[in-house]
Amino acid sequence: MRLALLLLTLLPLHAQDSRNTDIPHTDTHFTPRTDATLGDWKTRRARLQKQVLSAAGLLPYPEKCPLKPEIFGRLERSGYSIEKVLIQTLPGYYLGGNLYRPLGKPGKHPAILSPHGHWSYGRLEHQPSASLPGRAINLARQGYVVFAYDMVGYNDTTQTPHVFGNPREQLWGFGPLGLQLWNSIRAVDFVAGLPDVDAARLGATAASGGATQIFLLTAVDDRIKVAVPVNMISAIMQGGSPCENAPGLRFDTFNVDFGRMIAPRPLLMISASGDWTRNNLVEEVPAVKRTYELYDAVAQIEATQIDAPHNYNLASRNAMYPFFAKHLLQAANPETYQEKSFNLEGLADMLALHKRTLPLGALTYPQIFAQWVTAAQKQLQPSRERLALVFGLDTTSKVTSSTQGELTVLSREGRGDRVTGVATGPNPRIIVVHPTGATEAVRPKEAALLLTTFQTGRSKARRESPKRYHLTFNRSDDANRVQDILTAILYLQAQSPAPIELRCTETAAVWCTFAAAMSPVKVKLDAPLGTFKGTDQDFLDEFFVPGIQRAGGLSAALALATR
């Protein structure tokens, strides 16, 4: 046994663990996966939908407050009107925008949700590469109601900055991606409730970071019936802003999958030859089209590429208008819908908060976060699924094993991870975990598997410095340690149905408590938590997993572990 433990401390097993060598990031070139059947895809889509909502801090949805819409400052022009808008998407928090409506066209109209990317002037940007007012004006003239609204931190929506989400906020799933997605969901509520809108005919379009908002919204909200995301669905770049990169968003996935989630609804993918969508016609579009084929709906997807740098320019807009006309207006000749000249309004005539203040009771940034936490605490019912989502856990892969004497190396099939332990006797039913890994000091008298989890003891390995948005694509070290314990549980369970016990000390007691909570089989838990009480500071100091407090934290884990 001492020799086995010595070997464990000497073998370079960490070099074999893909979690140290295959570290995806926003500029990784991903390979689209193929689902064999529609049923396979629907199962995966349902999980991805929950993953998006979990990463956004929106699982479950916050309680929807009254929108209290303020619509004012109406301007009437040739064929359309423009109004300023403020809506309350959370109590005391307001989203600003402009409402463009057709004039001289009675009845209910289809509507277009129109967020924006990282243009300097946001929803009011006007330049050759993108004219957001021009887009909205032309759509309104063509017969749509258009709601152009802000990113967080832009124009009229500045109660938070655009860039936020410190580690404590991450524990509660509070960040710009989630707030923007919630704003979009509430924007759909607002538009669908307008008396001149046909809520069964809603579309959405935007470019760049706005396109990210579009495909995430469309992925989780089936009320959007037609989507035109521009210059963003890519296998080689996943987004460069915090508002596109919440922790946990892209565990085992990337933006092409989010584009696939629009199927079988009509989708137009507009790409550019001069940005990260340059390969669309040969790589990403065929991948998305394969999903439409599963639905027997390949006629619903179209694609075009514009020879230009990153944009939503005139050529891109003129590709978009006929697509919406075909699917939302049911126009007889959709190809005739093209952009016409337009006049811009002054910024003061467009900004909702020009010479105007937010409604009484509007909150500050710290107050918004405090309210987010309070609301989340009312939704802390123990849920194994919610915890598993923030950890990115896998309990379905087959666990394989190899042995070298008393050394046991576990790996999940297709994952490339390596979890090392020492069996102190035949048929162990006890898993022992210590923060420093398997050592003689923690050996019990009974047959046990002494586990060395990820980046502990001699399994510590040098890795590349984390790239931007590391936790968007990769589990935290603590989450990986919990996965390793679950992998060991699954391994022992496959050997025998006899009961399994977890014995864990010091910080490893926290790992084991969460592993027991999410284990698909009941385990006996011997894991004294000591001074760890599950406060925000405890998680920041000893056990960092973004979203863990939003998913129920320690109280949920304890309730589930003792079920």
What feature does the model see in each segment?
Residues 108-110, 142-145, 198-201, 222-226, ...:
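Loop/turn elements at helix/coil->beta-strand transitions in domains of secreted/extracellular proteins
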Residues 205-225, 229-230, 237-244, 248, ...:
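Catalytic-domain carbohydrate-binding cleft regions of carbohydrate-active enzymes
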Residues 106-193, 199, 232-243, 427, ...:
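Cap/lid segment of the alpha/beta-hydrolase catalytic domain
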Residues 100, 149, 205-207, 212, ...:
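Generic beta-strand/beta-sheet core signal
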Residues 189-251, 488-562:
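Primarily recognizes the serine-hydrolase "nucleophile elbow" in alpha/beta-hydrolase
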Residues 16-94, 270-429, 436-447, 454-498, ...:
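Alpha/beta-hydrolase-fold serine-hydrolase catalytic core, especially in secreted/extracellular enzymes
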Residues 7-15:
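Hydrophobic h-region of N-terminal signal peptides that target proteins for export
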Residues 1-6:
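Sec-dependent signal peptide recognition
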